[in-house]
UniProtKB/Swiss-Prot annotation:
PH domain mapped to chain residues: 611-717
CDD domains: PH1_TECPR1
Compartments where located: Cytoplasmic vesicle, Autophagosome membrane; Lysosome membrane
Protein name: Tectonin beta-propeller repeat-containing protein 1
Xref: InterPro entries: Beta-propeller_rpt_TECPR (IPR006624), Peroxin/Ferlin (IPR006614), PH-like_dom_sf (IPR011993), TECPR1-like_DysF (IPR010482), Tectonin_beta-propeller (IPR051513)
Upper lineage: Eukaryota, Metazoa, Chordata, Craniata, Vertebrata
Keywords in alphabetical order: Autophagy, Cytoplasmic vesicle, Lipid-binding, Lysosome, Membrane, Phosphoprotein, Repeat
Length: 1165
C-alpha cells in the first residue's frame, strides 16, 4: 500500500501531517501561516487561513506541473509578395488561438499568477499529426478555416504555424494564496469553510478536482477549472442556495452535502461528468428537532454528521442514485467534527480531549464501522525535547551490556508490544527541564540526573538486579508492560564517558547525537508528554485499508517516552547488518558440519514418495468436457542422488480404467489458467507446446490448486536442478493473467548454428502480479502493474501460491493490483422509437464484449478469475478510442464499424462502454516504487564485460500522464534508484526504450517516433529530441532498442526495423517491414529479437499470445530470416534485455578468418 498522509490543524492554527508509514505528526514545511481548517487530497491540500483567505498546498514531486500555451501565426498568399501577414478583412487575426476567434499575440500571453514561471521562450512546433513538417512548421490550406496539410499545393492560399511555450508551477511545498481576477465588486466574501472532492466523478480527466467554499454570509462558491495541470483554478462561481450555509462537504464522487444555520442539511443533486456543479438542492431534516446538524462529511456512499449536542450520526441508504439517503442512525461517541476520507474511512476529533480518532471496522459491507480508536502519535518536534542524558542510559539496558547503572538488569524476555488507549489528562506526566548545575553533580556511575522525572524514567525502564518485575508505577494510568525492542549494533559505551550535563554536553560525534537532545523551549504550548489538542482533521488524501492498518494505535508501554523515541529512530538499514552477519555465520557453520561427512554413503540410496488427490481433467477427445480424475505424483531418488518425478492421471472411459503419465523433467511450464468458474492450470511439454494443446487440470478450491502448483513446480525445478532466485541473465515474461515467469537462458539459445528450440525452454513462475516487466543483466528488474504502479525486484523468489520450500523466507512482500473489466451496451436506431436495445436478428448481443460475439451483462459478468474481487460499481468509460458524447455513446453506421463520438445522419447503431474495477491481493519478491504511476519503463541492456558496468544503470520511463522520466541512482545495491529526473517533451509519450549504447528511442501517443540525442552517463537526460518519421500511413505504439538494432511496432501489429543506423547518424534512414501478427517486441543486448505473436497455429489448436524468437539474426543480417515458436496461449509480454549470454564459438567459426567490417556493421559503443 503506498504511503499517504493525514492532515490536521491544532488549536494554535498549525498544520501537521501524519504518514501511514510513520508514527509522528510532522509540521507542515511552510508553517508561517495559521489555519482554521484544511481539506486534503492525495496531491494537494486546500485550506482557509486565519485571514479568511484560501490557500493551496501542492506537494512536491519529481514530475513538474507544466501547462502549454499555444498561439497560431496566420498568413495569406498574394500575387505580389507571396505569403505575408496582410490578411483580408474577413480573415481571422494574424495571431490567434486555434479557432481564430481570439486575438492572441505572443507578447500578450501572460502568466496567470505569480506562482508560475516560464520554462523557455516561444518556439515553433514542427510536429503535425505525428509527422514532422518542413523547416518552419507551416501547414497549408485553401482558406480559413479548412483542412490543413504539411505539404504546399498549387491552391494553398493560406498557411499557419503553431507557436508553443510551457509554463511551470513553482509554488510547491508552500501555501500559495489563490489569486482572483474577478471583478472586485463580485469577489466572494471572506470564506468560512471549504471542501475538496470530485476526483472520482465518472471518468473525469485525471487530476480534476471540485472545490467548494462557503463565505461568512452563507453563500456557496465553486472554483472553476481546478485540475492537476491547473492547481489554482481560474475563477469563483456563485451558486444559489435556499438558505444561509454554514459548512459544506464534497465527496470523491458525486455527493455534496451542506449544513444550514437552522440545522438542516442541503443535498446537491445532478452532479455528473458534464455538470460537476450539479443542478438543484434538496433539504434533509436533522435527526432531531431540538439539535440541528452542526457539521457534516460525505464520502463515496456514506454521510456522517455531528449535531449541536456533539452526537455523531450516520446516514443510511446513501448512494449516487439516492444522494439524500433514507434515515439517521445514532453512533456511539461525542465529536466536535468528523471527516470521511478515502475508502469511506472516517476520522473525528473528540469533544472532551481534542484527540484525533479513527473509526475502526469500516468495510464495504459495514460502512458504519464498529468503534472509535484514538491515534497515539506524538509530534515530530517532541522528539527533540524528550531526550536527556538519563534517557540515554535508561535506553542502554535494552540494547546490550555496554551501559550499566548501579541497579540495572536485562529486560524480560516476555516483552511484547501492547495496544493501549491514550492516557487521560490525569495520567500525563509533564517532563521537567533538566537543570545544568544539578546535572553536573549527578551520579557519574549511573549517569542519572537529579531531576525526579529522570529517576522515574530509569526505575520504570530498568528493573533492579536479579528481579524480573518492574517497580510498580506510582502514577495513575494503565499498567506498563515490557516492550519488544529491535536489535541494534549501535554502541552506547560512549555515553558512559560523558557527564550528564545538558544536551549541549554531548559531543556531536556520539552515535546518538542525531536524537537532538535540546532543553524545552518556552514557546511550546504543550508539555513533553502532553498530547496536542486538535481543531480539524482531513483524511481526503489518506488511504487506510483494513488488511494493512498503520502503526498509529500501538505504543510500547514499558518504555519511557525518550526510550520509545530512541527505539523508533533505529532504521531498518541499521538492523539489517546483524541479520546478514548471523546468516553468514550460520551458512559457514552448515558448510563446516556437512563437508566432513560427504564421503559417507547414504543410509537409504533410493526413496519413493507419492502424493495423491482428486482433480478434474479436460478430456482431449469427445465429449470434450471436464472429467473427474485421480492424480498421483510419484517422486523417487536415483543412485546419483537426483530426484525425479512422474505424474499419473487416472480416468475412466466407458467403465474402463485408463491413465496417462507425464515425466516432470519434460514439463516446460505450469501455467494458471484464466477461468471465471474453476481453479485450473495447464501443463506444457515440448510436444504439447508445438500442438498448442496443454494438459489442463482443475482443483475444487483455490488452496488445492495452489498446493498442486507449488508441489509440481518444486518437483520440476528439482528435476532440472533449478533453485533459488533467477540469474541476472534470465528471460522474464508475463501472461495475460498477470502471472510472472522466468527462464534461464541456455548458451545455445542465441547460437547461429543449431540454436536451442524455444519450445524446450523451461519456464518457472514467480510470485506477484504485473502487466509488464523489464530486466537488466546486472540483476535490476522493474515491473508495472495494471494500475500503473511501479515495482522493483527484491532478489527473492516464490511468494503468491509458492510458500514454504518453494519460496524464499525473506524479500517477499504483499502486492496488490487493480484492473478494469469492460463490457459494451449496444443499441440500434429505428424510425419509431429511436435508439433502443432491440436489434436485428443478425446483430450482436445488446450487452456484449468488445467483439460482440460473447454476451456480457452487468449481472452476469464476473471478475477475471476467482482471485479477483470487485471494488467498484459499474461506470461509463469515456476514455475509449474514437471519443464519446456526453453520455458516453459512440456511433457508427453498423456493427462492426469505425466508431466516433458524434452522431451523423448515417449512424444507425451506437455503443457505450461500461467498466468496473476489481482488485487482487497477492505476495511476491516486489517492492513498490512510489509515488509516480508509470506506463512504460526501459533499462539499458548491458553485457557483463561492458565498459559502462561501473556506472549507474540508466533507466527511463513514461508516466501514466505521458511525461518522460529518467531514474537516477539505480545500481545493483539500490535497484529502486533515488529520484526521478523529468525530461521535457512537447506532447505525451506512450513508449520508450534505451539501447546498449545509450541511444534513447520513444513513441508519442500520436504514433510519432523520437530519438533523444547526447545521452551519456555524465549527461543522463540528453539534450534534445529528434522527430523521426513513422512508417507510411502507420501509427507506432512501441519501440525497442538493442545494441545496434531498433525495432518498432505499429497499431496494426506490423513489426518494423530501422535501417541505416551508424555511429555518425544514430537516427537511421528508413523503416523496413519485417513481419505482421506481432503484439510485443523485445530487443536484447546481443540484438536478439523476441516477440509475442498474436495468433500461432499449432497441430491441434490455435493459440493467442505466443513467445517467438527471431532466427538467423547476425551482424550482417540484423533482421534475421525466420521465427521459432515457443510457449504460447495467453502470453502478453516478454523481456530478453537481460540475456547477454553469447553462444560458444564453433570450430568452423574459430578457423574462419574474421571478415572485414562493412559499412552496415554494428555500431561501436
Amino acid at each position: 500500500m503506498p504511503n499517504s498522509v493525514l492532515w490536521a490543524v491544532d488549536l494554535f492554527g498549525r498544520v501537521y501531517t501524519l504518514s501511514t508509514a510513520g508514527q509522528y505528526w510532522e509540521m507542515c514545511k511552510d508553517s508561517q501561516l495559521e489555519f482554521k481548517r484544511v481539506s486534503a487530497t492525495t496531491q494537494c491540500c486546500w485550506g482557509i487561513a486565519c485571514d479568511n483567505q484560501v490557500y493551496v498546498y501542492v506537494c512536491a514531486s519529481d514530475v513538474p506541473i507544466r501547462r502549454r500555451e499555444e498561439a497560431y501565426e496566420n498568413q495569406r498568399w498574394n500575387p505580389m509578395g507571396g505569403f505575408c501577414e496582410k490578411l483580408l478583412l474577413s480573415d481571422r487575426w494574424g495571431w490567434s488561438d486555434v479557432s481564430g476567434l481570439q486575438h492572441r499575440p505572443l507578447d500578450r500571453v501572460a502568466l496567470p499568477s505569480p506562482h508560475w514561471e516560464w520554462e523557455s521562450d516561444w518556439y515553433v512546433d514542427e510536429n503535425f499529426g505525428g509527422e514532422p513538417t518542413e523547416k518552419g512548421g507551416w501547414t497549408y490550406a485553401i482558406d480559413f478555416p479548412a483542412t490543413y496539410t504539411k505539404d504546399k499545393k498549387w491552391n494553398s492560399c493560406v498557411r499557419r504555424r503553431k507557436w508553443i511555450r510551457y509554463r511551470r508551477y513553482k509554488s510547491r511545498d508552500i501555501w500559495a494564496k489563490i489569486p482572483s481576477k474577478d471583478d472586485p465588486k463580485e469577489l466572494p466574501d471572506p470564506f468560512n469553510d471549504l471542501s475538496v472532492g470530485g476526483w472520482e466523478i465518472t471518468e473525469e480527466p485525471v487530476g480534476r478536482l471540485s472545490v467548494w467554499a462557503v463565505s461568512l454570509q452563507g453563500k456557496v462558491w465553486y472554483r472553476e477549472d481546478v485540475s492537476h495541470s491547473n492547481p489554482e483554478g481560474s475563477s469563483w462561481s456563485l451558486l444559489d442556495t435556499p438558505g444561509e450555509v454554514v459548512q459544506i462537504s464534497c465527496g470523491p464522487h458525486d455527493l455534496l452535502w451542506a449544513t444550514l444555520w437552522e440545522g438542516q442539511a442541503l443535498v446537491r443533486e445532478g452532479i455528473n461528468r458534464s455538470n460537476p456543479k450539479g443542478s438543484s438542492w434538496s433539504i434533509v431534516e436533522p435527526p432531531g428537532s431540538e439539535n440541528g446538524v452542526m457539521h457534516i462529511s460525505v464520502g463515496v456512499s456514506v454521510v456522517w454528521a455531528v449535531t449541536k449536542d456533539w452526537k455523531v450520526w450516520f446516514r443510511r441508504g446513501v448512494n449516487s442514485h439516492n444522494p439524500c439517503g433514507t434515515s439517521w442512525i445514532e453512533m456511539v461517541g461525542e465529536m466536535t467534527m468528523v471527516n470521511v476520507g478515502m475508502n469511506d474511512q472516517v476520522w473525528g476529533i473528540g469533544c472532551e480531549d481534542r484527540a484525533v480518532y479513527f473509526r475502526q471496522g469500516v468495510t464495504p459491507s459495514e460502512l458504519s464501522g464498529k468503534t472509535w480508536k484514538a491515534i497515539i502519535a506524538a509530534r515530530e518536534c517532541d522528539r527533540s525535547h524528550s531526550g536527556s542524558s538519563s534517557s540515554l542510559l535508561s535506553a542502554g539496558c535494552f540494547f546490550g551490556d555496554e551501559v550499566r547503572g548501579s541497579g540495572e538488569s536485562a529486560p524480560s524476555d516476555t516483552d511484547a508490544s501492547s495496544e493501549v488507549e491514550r492516557p487521560g489528562p490525569g495520567q500525563i506526566l509533564p517532563a521537567e527541564p533538566l537543570d545544568d548545575s544539578k546535572n553536573a553533580t549527578g551520579n557519574s556511575a549511573s549517569g542519572l540526573g537529579a531531576g525526579r522525572t529522570a529517576e522515574d524514567t530509569v526505575e520504570d525502564a530498568c528493573p533492579a538486579e536479579g528481579s524480573r518485575e518492574a517497580r510498580p508505577n506510582t502514577h495513575p494510568g494503565p499498567a506498563p508492560t515490557p516492550a519488544e525492542l529491535p536489535w541494534t549494533n549501535i554502541d552506547l559505551k560512549e555515553a558512559k564517558k560523558v557527564p550528564s550535563h545538558s544536551a549541549a554536553g554531548f559531543p556531536e560525534t556520539t552515535s546518538l547525537s542525531s536524537l537532538g537532545l535540546l532543553p524545552l523551549g518556552l514557546e511550546e504550548p504543550y508539555g513533553v508528554d502532553d498530547h496536542p489538542l486538535w481543531a480539524w482533521v482531513s483524511g481526503g488524501g489518506c488511504v487506510v485499508e483494513a488488511c494493512a492498518m498503520p502503526r498509529w494505535f500501538t505504543v510500547q508501554a514499558g518504555l519511557s517516552s525518550s526510550v520509545h523515541m530512541l527505539s523508533l529512530s533505529i532504521t531498518p538499514a541499521q538492523t539489517a547488518a546483524w541479520r546478514k552477519q548471523i546468516f553468514q555465520q550460520l551458512t559457514e557453520r552448515t558448510k563446516r558440519e556437512l563437508e566432513n561427512f560427504r564421503h559417507y554413503e547414504q543410509a537409504v540410496e533410493q526413496s519413493v514418495w507419492v502424493k495423491t488427490g482428486a482433480l478434474q481433467w479436460w478430456c482431449d477427445w469427445k465429449p470434450h468436457k471436464w472429467v473427474d480424475v485421480r492424480l498421483a505424483l510419484e517422486q523417487f531418488t536415483g543412485h546419483d542422488g537426483v530426484r525425479d518425478s512422474i505424474l499419473f492421471i487416472y480416468y475412466v472411459v466407458h467403465e474402463e480404467k485408463k491413465y496417462i503419465h507425464i515425466f516432470l523433467n519434460e514439463v516446460v511450464a505450469l501455467v494458471p489458467v484464466l477461468n471465471e468458474t474453476k481453479h485450473s492450470f495447464a501443463l506444457y511439454t515440448p510436444e504439447r507446446t508445438r500442438q498448442r494443446w496443454p494438459v489442463r487440470l482443475a482443483a475444487a478450491t483455490e488452496q488445492d490448486m495452489n498446493d498442486w502448483l507449488a508441489l509440481l513446480s518444486l518437483s520440476c525445478c528439482e528435476s532440472r536442478k533449478v533453485q533459488g532466485r533467477p540469474s541476472p541473465q534470465a528471460i522474464w515474461s508475463i501472461t495475460c493473467k498477470g502471472d510472472i515467469f522466468v527462464s534461464e537462458p541456455s548458451p545455445d539459445l542465441e547460437a547461429h548454428e543449431h540454436p536451442l528450440p524455444c519450445d524446450q525452454m523451461f519456464w518457472r513462475q514467480m510470485g506477484g502480479h504485473l502487466r509488464m516487466v523489464e530486466a537488466n543483466s546486472r540483476g535490476v528488474v522493474w515491473g508495472i502493474g495494471y494500475d500503473h504502479t511501479a515495482w522493483v525486484y527484491t532478489g527473492g523468489y516464490g511468494g503468491g501460491c509458492f510458500q514454504g520450500l518453494a519460496s524464499s523466507t525473506s524479500n517477499i512482500y504483499t502486492q496488490s493490483d487493480v484492473k478494469c473489466v469492460h463490457i459494451y451496451e449496444n443499441q440500434r436506431w429505428n424510425p419509431v422509437t429511436g435508439y433502443t436495445s432491440r436489434g436485428l436478428p443478425t446483430d450482436r448481443y445488446m450487452w456484449s464484449d468488445a467483439s460482440g460475439l460473447q454476451e456480457c451483462t452487468k449481472a452476469g459478468t464476473k471478475p477475471p478469475s476467482l482471485q479477483w474481487a470487485w471494488v467498484s460499481d459499474w461506470f461509463v468509460d469515456f476514455s475509449v478510442p474514437g471519443g464519446t458524447d456526453q453520455e458516453g455513446w459512440q456511433y457508427a453506421s453498423d456493427f462492426p464499424a469505425s466508431y466516433h463520438g458524434s452522431k451523423t445522419m448515417k449512424d444507425f447503431v451506437r455503443r457505450r462502454c461500461w467498466a468496473r474495477k476489481c482488485k487482487l491481493v497477492t505476495s511476491g519478491p516486489w517492492l513498490e516504487v512510489p509515488p509516480i504511476a508509470l506506463r512504460d519503463v526501459s533499462i539499458i541492456p548491458e553485457s557483463p564485460g561492458a565498459e559502462g558496468s561501473g556506472h549507474s544503470i540508466a533507466l527511463w520511463a513514461v508516466s501514466d500522464k505521458g511525461d518522460v522520466l529518467c531514474r537516477l541512482g539505480v545500481s545493483e545495491l539500490n535497484p529502486a534508484g533515488s529520484s526521478w529526473l523529468h525530461v521535457g517533451t512537447d506532447q505525451p509519450f506512450a513508449s520508450i526504450s534505451i539501447g546498449a549504447c545509450y541511444q534513447v528511442w520513444a513513441v508519442a501517443r500520436d504514433g510519432s517516433a523520437f530519438y533523444r540525442g547526447s545521452v551519456y552517463p555524465s549527461q543522463p537526460a540528453g539534450d534534445c529530441w529528434y522527430h523521426i518519421p513513422s512508417p507510411p500511413r502507420q501509427r507506432l505504439k512501441q519501440v525497442s532498442a538493442g545494441q545496434t538494432s531498433v525495432y518498432a511496432l505499429d497499431e496494426n501489429g506490423n513489426l518494423w526495423y530501422r535501417q541505416g543506423i551508424t555511429p555518425s547518424y544514430p537516427q537511421g534512414s528508413s523503416w523496413e517491414h519485417v513481419s505482421n501478427n506481432v503484439c510485443r517486441v523485445s530487443v536484447g543486448p546481443l540484438d536478439q529479437v523476441w516477440v509475442i505473436a498474436n495468433k500461432v497455429q499449432g497441430s491441434h489448436s490455435l493459440s493467442r499470445g505466443t513467445v517467438c524468437h527471431r532466427t538467423g539474426v547476425q551482424p550482417h543480417e540484423p533482421k534475421g530470416h525466420g521465427w521459432d515458436y515457443g510457449i504460447g496461449g495467453g502470453w502478453d509480454h516478454i523481456s530478453v534485455r537481460a540475456n547477454a549470454t553469447r553462444a560458444p564459438r564453433s570450430s568452423s567459426q574459430e578457423q574462419e578468418p574474421s571478415a572485414p567490417p562493412e559499412a552496415h556493421g554494428p555500431v561501436c559503443c
